[in-house]
Amino acid sequence: MASQPPQPPSGQPDTQYEEYQSEVITETTNRPTPAADVYEITPTNDVMDDRYEHEHDDYESGAMYETVRTWSPQSRPELVRIASVFSRIDSHPDVAPTTEDGGQLNRRDTLAGVKIGDPVLDPTKPEFDFYKWARMFTHVMEKEGIKRNRTGVMFRNLTVLGSGSAVQYQDTFLSPFAAPFRPGELCGKGRNPEKVILHDFNGAIREGELLMVLGRPGSGCSTFLKAICGELHGLQKKKESIIHYNGVSQHTFKKELRGEAVYSAEDEHHFPHLTVGQTLEFAAAARTPSKRVLGLSRKDFSTHLARVMMSVFGLSHTYNTKVGDDYVRGVSGGERKRVSIAEIALSGAPICCWDNSTRGLDSATALEFTKALKIGSQVGGITQCLAIYQASQAIYDIFDKVIVLYEGRQIFFGPTRIAKQYFEEMGWYCPPRQTTADFLTSVTNPKERIAKEGYENRVPRTAVEFERYWKQSQNNKLLLANMDRFEAEYPPEEGHLEKLRETHGQAQAKHTASKSPYRISVPMQVKLCTVRAYQRLWGDKSSTIATNISQIMMALIIGSLFFDTPQTTDGFFAKGSVIFFAILLNGLMSITEINGLCKATEPIVPNAQRPIVVKHVNFAFYHAYSEALAGIVADIPIKFLLALVFNIIIYFLGGLERSAAKFFIFFLFTFITILTMSAIFRTLAAATKTIPQALALAGVMILALVIYTGFTLQPSYMHPWFKWILYINPIAYAYEALLVNEVHGNRYRCATPIPPYGSGKNFACAVAGAVPGEMSVSGDAWVESSYDYSYAHIWRNLGILLGFLAFFYFVYLMVSELNLSSASSAEFLVFRRGHLPKNFQGSKDEEAAAGGVMHPNDPARLPPTNTNGAAGETAPGGSTVAVIPPQKDIFTWRNVTYDITIKGEPRRLLDNISGWVRPGTLTALMGVSGAGKTTLLDALAQRTTMGVITGDMLVNGRPLDSSFQRKTGYVQQQDLHLETTTVREALRFSADLRQPKSVSRKEKYEYVEDVIKMLSMEDFSEAVVGNPGEGLNVEQRKLLTIGVELAAKPQLLLFLDEPTSGLDSQSSWSIVTFLRKLADNGQAVLSTIHQPSGILFEQFDRLLFLAKGGRTVYFGDIGKNSETLLNYFETHGAEPCGPSENPAEYMLNIVGAGPSGKSNIDWPVVWKESEESRHVQQELDRIQSETSKRNEGHGQSAEKEPGEFAMPFTSQLYCVTTRVFQQYWRTPSYIWGKLLLGLASALFIGFSFFLQNSSMAGLQNSLFSIFMLTTIFSSLVQQIMPRFVTQRDLFEVRERPSRAYSWKVFLLANIIVEIPYQILLGIIAWASLFYPTFGAHLSSERQGILLLYCVQFFIFASTFAQMIIAGLPDAETAGGIATTMFGLMVTFNGVLQKPNALPGFWRFMWRVSPITYTVGGLAATSLHSREVKCAQNELAIFDPPSGATCAQYLQKLVEAGAPGKLYNPMSTSQCQYCPLSSGDQFLGGSEIHWSDRWRNFGIGWAYIVFNIFATVALYYLIRVRKSSGRPNRIISVITYHLSQFGTYCRAFITGRKEKCPRKREQIGKIY
């Protein structure tokens, strides 16, 4: 490092300063006026002055107009690219525009030259011309006095702070135990230290300017854009930092004008089931101004505006297509990106910040998008900032200014045209073919930048030195002077704020606060969001209908369960049960409102829609509470209809009193309960940050609500430490009201009078509330004696429920508005404790690690001059020759065609594609968006799971065998890795399973170390993969993806799908030049790439170029300087490629890529008829002929392949099980969440039912305590399934196609790993529940049996979860099915309805329910031989006949074998008879017997074994056979016979006797 701070080179004259100093003098006195015919628009002088009065800039001299002048105003494709210029117009044929004095304009506007109502102004017509539409709009806006805000932004001393450090340590299961030995971390010190993300930024962006933000990933580009827009959620801006918008402070601007500065995130968030038209029409409606052109209605204005934007961005054909997402089929990824762009354009914001919005777009589309931004800035005055990772020279030249960031420090800010010269004069060398954007970013990469000769010790090296150099430069001084003039023009809070307020107020609707950032009032927001909520429901009708049907089916099941309940005292428990079920199911059906991460269709899923709501709130579309209120309003009618159907079924089928008054009271309370519980669950979801948090809290809350309803634990048996829950439980008030409503005024015949032969006053009914000598029991007396309920409380309870409802709705709306932002933190690496590299530093000097500054003539740094030469050294480096095994096999494909069926219609994705890949060559696969590049790659790699592929794919002339996938590497576009593993462990896992058994483990691991060195991953080889932001960054993940495939030593070919996607230009260069090195050393490589720069493109040897429809445009050599490729296109009619033009972009342009691109030449037809195409076929024939001769020379003794997998089954099982154990161990949140759920639930149940007495109610409560333990089953299952899905996704997407290990190994490993934790959970639950509930007096044998049952139950839960999720696509779908099945199991286990009371149809359900045997075994073991001591209200109290004792009077009853016990046999009055004498008698009513305990235990293990076999069978039938493309035999047989049955039915109905073909051979094809 230089001893002195770097200075500007003294030997070089500061030509920049002299040049721009002179420009400042000339600009302020002789500012050029733009040509009036640039767009053939002639605005009035007032508009001209308003637009250009502040255009002078110390850096600019009219250059911003030069680019536009070169674009032909007559070229409609160029004009269609105008993106966000205007957002207010309609050409209503029946309305004439008016001038300011009230006069009407003529139907033919001479200024625009277009007749209002002309088809060119209708975006739905093919004649639509956006240019003419914009001209008409501009004129009408001027005449009607409609204004729009315009503003620039200035930032001074901008410093942004975040939390986090450069490194964190991975937590494990034992981390909580080690925390006391790390007091610093325990106290919060050192865990999240403050970190400066942006250091002291300065700059000014004038209105209408376009700023490019350049920097490597992690340099602070996103944070800078967020700071400009004021969206620093979780980050902190220093007090000294100043940001203002033409004099308006950011605080005031964001408070009153939030929607005027918007930030477009890199990811897209939309409601997937809304169509594109609905999405954009909503955005237009939310920002529709109050004053509109031509006096149009809001509906017409917003609809037309959305249509215009869809036409501009090439989305008109998707109007009725769903937006979709990763789970819902919709528009393509590129189209979804354009939907996001159009949404922001419709916001009409004068300041827009775009975060890598060109990601995933091909170069032609990216260029169109950038041109659209440019025109929006120049014509609409929009100030725009765009962070971009890979920018072509054409894109770079469109921008006015550029800011370069280096590790959070500003190292340049100024005009784009001087940036390159600035860094060259600093001493850096720019290679001739490198784009300016790549060069500017490369100077921030020590491994990429090149110093000029003689400047090696003078150039800055670190980010701090670059920043120091910048601050001492004349360009910075000029910038500061310009900022001073900017502030002088716009004094703080003066003038411009009132102007902005006036313009904003003009756009606001009535009843909207003047200082509100929103344009429409709250009622209008609620109405708009309510309509959208119903659109979302309609968009996912199937899901909505399925949910409602499942609820109705549950009502039918529960109602039939209690069908024909006797209207006697024996029916009291059944009535309590059916009402308990009714209120519980009504109340808890809203719990699904919490979960909906992948289903944002329901208008009540706060967590699912939160990112979308946050985005729309930032765009000032609506208040968050308006969306929340709209969800409530939209949901009430749906809930009402569902509740009506549900409660009619359960009320009348369940045997409740058929009284109109009582039914409507029943419905009123159940409906209010639904709304109240919905409000509670909404509040819970809105108050938490993630769905798992909300579900965890909901699980505990539901347990408390169920126990303290009053049914499972009667109020008189509640202990004081938890009884308070009863008073805050809405379900408890509803249950009391419904129960007293049902029995009020009714008397019930005594089913079992004691003694049955008594008369007069000499008998009693053994039911609470009974009166001696009466054969019936008052319902009111029963509920008062049993529950202390009163009919007088019914309307009081309704008032309490309404109070709960209002309170939670209010809290929900408030929390929805306040709990939107999420904390942000700096990115960091995660290491295992004890594995941090010794030389690792948080922000180390990469220059020193790189070994100094590179020289311009160093051959290791210069790009190769010919495609066959050695590639330059890049970040992934090292010795490659000794690592890559030699390859000799040639992979060829001929006439590959791929057809699929979509909605019953055939579609061809690939059309007769031919080609080959030789060892030692690097082949590029390119094409326009939607051409089928990834599809072709999947087809060649044998990774398609649907459709029909035809054609020949050969290796050395032989058909592909079962080992092909194992012998090839496939680097997917998505970097899928297990987040808990380290880089080295991931590579070793791949080497262990994918290299053959003949290679020793030592050799495999040595090869892994070679791969680590080859990819330069030494610094993070022990880092944990983690999640984005908390682990490896984008480039490191991509290197790991490549490394995993290299570690497998692919013998044939390496496929790569978009290896540079999401990377900056330097990282992309590193990856591609590394691939070049692999090819030079014998590897065959085929890679798709969509945005290659000129120097990247020349790294490839051969190109396969596809057009839409999967048709070949070109296949052949690229040639030196792309001469071979360019000659082909130029000789077939294409315009010549310019000497400085990027050949990759040139090709995309000539074939008509981009939303509005067109080509007059059908290039696929040209290729098909070309000589080059015939040469390809001849070469394929020659290759096949040569390889066939070679194969014949070797005879039939070809090397025998080891088979589908490289390693045997046992080795696979060991490796995979070890990794899954490792994943669980390193995911303490899951393990501790599981254990704490079991511990907390068991303790809560145990202390709620603490030491129940031996009364009949006490025994019932004890049985309910066991029953409640089984209710945590559902929560456990919901926890297990997402973990399984995580492993399965990785296996099915990457490891199974690579033939790393068998699907049977995957299933067994996941089953095995769950068992130890389930055993531990069973032990915890056993100790936490049974000791508090039953005490320690049980024998050791019984305690042991209880422990065995608890462990068995939790193992059953895990295997059941895996059985359900095995064949289903996601945890949400499986969770719904599991919950339904669990509901059936607990319903029919004999606790809530005794088996002998079940209708005959349902008795089989009691026998097949696994919970029946678990509850039976636990209850029999706990209550066997327990003596019953009836409570006072449970005794049958009566007087014996005069002169007889109680024993004498009941002697006949005792001799008949009555189960009860007489407490006072010698008394002559007030005989006290308890109907039961032992716990076995009580259990016998539920058919639970002590003698069945071991039988039940054995049946439990049978269910576990069944779950395991069913898991394997379901996975095989649904996912293995389906993915293999083979027909499912069972489904085929069923389908065949159903079709035959249907044929006979049709013949019978029509009276025709058709003969159905049932020949043996036809059935044989199926079987």
From Swiss-Prot:
PANTHER family per record: ATP-BINDING CASSETTE TRANSPORTER (PTHR19241)
Similarity section: Belongs to the ABC transporter superfamily. ABCG family. PDR (TC 3.A.1.205) subfamily.
GO cellular component assignments: plasma membrane
Superkingdom of this protein's organism: Eukaryota
Biased composition regions of type Polar residues, renumbered to the chain: 22-32
Protein's name in the database: ABC multidrug transporter MDR1
Membrane topology value: Multi-pass membrane protein
Domain called ABC transporter: residue spans: 167-432, 891-1134
Catalytic activity field: voriconazole(in) + ATP + H2O = voriconazole(out) + ADP + phosphate + H(+); fluconazole(in) + ATP + H2O = fluconazole(out) + ADP + phosphate + H(+); (R)-miconazole(in) + ATP + H2O = (R)-miconazole(out) + ADP + phosphate + H(+); (S)-miconazole(in) + ATP + H2O = (S)-miconazole(out) + ADP + phosphate + H(+)
Disulfide links within the chain: none
Taxonomic lineage from the root: Eukaryota, Fungi, Dikarya, Ascomycota, Pezizomycotina
Region of interest called Disordered, as start-end residue ranges on this chain: 1-37, 1172-1202
Sites where the protein binds ATP: G927, V928, S929, G930, A931, G932, K933, T934
Keywords assigned by UniProt, alphabetized: ATP-binding, Cell membrane, Glycoprotein, Membrane, Nucleotide-binding, Repeat, Transmembrane, Transmembrane helix, Transport
Species this protein is from: Trichophyton interdigitale (strain MR816)
Record field: transmembrane: 543-563, 571-591, 636-656, 661-681, 691-711, 798-818, 1231-1251, 1257-1277, 1305-1325, 1345-1365, 1372-1392, 1498-1518
Glycosylation, residue list: N149, N157, N356, N819, N895, N912, N1253
GO molecular function, one term: ATP hydrolysis activity
Primary location recorded for the protein, binned into one broad class: membrane
